[in-house]
Amino acid sequence: MIVPPIKSQGIKTKLVPWINDVIDSSGLNLDDAQWIEPFFGTGVVGLNAPVKGHHIVGDTNPHIICFYEGMKNGSINPFSVREYLEREGKLLLTSKEDGYVHFREVRDRFNQEHSPYDFLFLSRAGFNGMMRFNRHGDWNIPFCKKPNRFTPAYITKICNQVASSSRVIHSG
């Protein structure tokens, strides 16, 4: 199963086998079928869909779309993600208030610049894997209070998720 790099509460990972069983038993020609998903979210369902034809995805969250568009055009890749997370992880680990000062810096930067890398960081460093925005569209989730969040193993896991998701995106 492809696990997406974006972390979010309520991810449908456990439903993917059931959804795919329903699709597989539908009798449709999956080689020519289209996959249309208006609420892509983290992408776990779409990235694992058995449909081989054209995929059309959307979401009301422009940051999700921007992140996956970056993966599609190659500007977001395992190497750039590793470089970013290693740098930001070190800053988080050495930041005052057990990392909270740096978390706020990234959050404030994201709210101004909307970087897909900052979006990924916040989805992984935010409390309980939640994703929420206030009425102004600003990130509105507190820090998970784990300054050592971005260990080498965790960064590798995220980079592997970027790589496997990218392969699916580029195969269609």
Predicted regions and their residues:
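S-adenosyl-L-methionine
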Residues: 1-39, 44-45
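A conserved short coil-to-beta-strand element within the FAD-binding core of flavoproteins
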Residues: 172
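Aromatic pocket-lining residues of Rossmann-like dinucleotide-binding sites
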Residues: 49
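Class I S-adenosyl-L-methionine-dependent methyltransferase module
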Residues: 52-169
